[in-house]
């Protein structure tokens, strides 16, 4: 079969049952942020079974598997941690069963993002089997703690020199769309300082909540203004308050 797309398609069809089994077994393992050890072990075993050229776990706990040895370094990334399931009784299907119905796999992580990892592991394997890795090394990275500490996993990989790819493909769910960019992201903490006083004599103190109130209103107005000036490629920026706390 000379057409590379046809070769990949045929191999994908052949490996579909294995991909489904692999994904269902990952879904069956609870893997919230900072609790990924068991699911990392399962993914590592799959890479080993498929004969990846190199498989390792870095100091943070990220799993990295390589196929090919060319000079061009391509990373295909997916975070292997998930958010929690909340109240399991509110689910219409068992979040840890990986139920298959009408060609769809249901469960925590099926879409975000263990499905992407299953596709990446087998995609790299298929690319090698189809003879498409001439001059290329592909690293599949199953990264940890993305849900709680977005960016920490790749910050570690780059700062510690674990891997320095030329190209990165991210397997976040996009309904199979190809996205060529993403808005930047920042986390900021704003503090206001008060002075305590008895509730019957508030004039003797400084209320830090009152000092925060206009800041909250300003942030809400900023989000409205950002929506009025969308970028032609990336769309509108957003800003949101996600947490307020008093020590």
Regions found by a protein language model. Name each.
Residues 25, 122-129, 214-220:
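Short glycine/serine- and small hydrophobic-enriched flexible loop segments
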Residues 72-75, 103-104, 139, 166-169, ...:
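Structural motif
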Residues 155-247:
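Midchain, well-structured core segments that form catalytic/ion-binding scaffolds
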């Amino acid at each position: 079969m000379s057409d590379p797309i046809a070769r990949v398609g045929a191999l994908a069809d052949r490996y579909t049952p294995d991909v489904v089994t692999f994904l269902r077994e990952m879904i069956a393992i609870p893997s919230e942020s900072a609790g990924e050890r068991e699911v990392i072990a399962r993914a590592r075993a799959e890479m080993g079974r498929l004969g990846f050229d190199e498989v390792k776990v870095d100091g943070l706990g990220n799993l990295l598997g390589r196929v090919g040895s060319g000079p061009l370094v391509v990373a295909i990334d997916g975070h292997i941690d998930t958010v929690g399931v909340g109240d399991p009784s509110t689910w219409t299907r068992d979040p840890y069963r990986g139920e298959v119905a009408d060609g769809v796999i249901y469960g925590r992580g099926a879409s975000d993002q263990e499905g992407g990892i299953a596709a990446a592991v087998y995609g790299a394997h298929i690319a090698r089997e189809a003879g498409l890795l001439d001059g290329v090394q592909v690293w599949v990275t199953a990264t940890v703690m993305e849900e709680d500490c977005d960016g920490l996993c790749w910050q570690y990989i780059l700062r510690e020199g674990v891997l320095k790819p030329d190209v990165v493909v991210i397997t976040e769910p996009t309904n199979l769309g190809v996205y060529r960019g993403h808005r930047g992201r920042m986390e900021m903490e704003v503090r206001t300082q008060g002075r305590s006083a008895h509730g019957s004599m508030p004039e003797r103190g400084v209320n830090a909540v009152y000092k925060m109130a206009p800041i909250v209103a300003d942030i809400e107005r900023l989000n409205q203004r950002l929506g009025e000036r969308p970028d032609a490629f990336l769309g509108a920026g957003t800003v949101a308050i996600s947490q307020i706390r008093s020590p």
